Regions:
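AAA+ P-loop ATPase motor domain of ring mechanoenzymes
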Residues: 1-131
Length: 131
């Protein structure tokens, strides 16, 4: 690394796993913290496709209960839209599709979640959770 003359941009979501000697060789380290509730609310609203009616979607609940990065929120919405389309729900995105996609994203991240975290939407996923 010391002999490299170009610009290198490195990204990780596991900084604590990086060796201190490696970190000392980096000239600049910029941290991007997870978005807060207000930022997540804006992200949830902004990633819903324009063709989708957001009327039944509880963005406030999603932003408050699930501390996720923007990329994870975008992946959740994408997956929920695919699932809805697969089930024939034309341009209709439901909270059930979203909370199932949230659970799927938490599973991918190997992040623990509880039915309590899903609040009033817990019955929508209770029968589909992994043991």
């Amino acid at each position: 690394m010391e002999r490299f003359k170009g610009l290198a941009i490195l990204a990780t979501n596991r900084r604590k796993d990086l060796d201190e000697a490696f970190l000392r060789r980096l000239r600049f380290v910029i941290e991007f913290p997870l978005p807060g509730t207000a930022e997540r609310l804006r992200i949830w609203r902004s990633v819903i496709p324009a063709e989708v009616d957001p009327g039944e979607l509880d963005f406030d609940f999603l932003a408050q209960r699930f501390p996720l990065a923007g990329g994870h929120i975008r992946a959740i919405v994408f997956h929920a839209c695919l699932q809805s389309a697969q089930m024939g729900a034309e341009r209709r995105l439901t909270m059930q599709a979203l909370v199932l996609a949230v659970q799927r994203e938490y599973d991918k991240l190997e992040r623990a979640s509880s039915l309590d975290q899903f609040g009033k939407y817990a019955p929508l996923i209770a029968t589909r959770r992994k043991p």
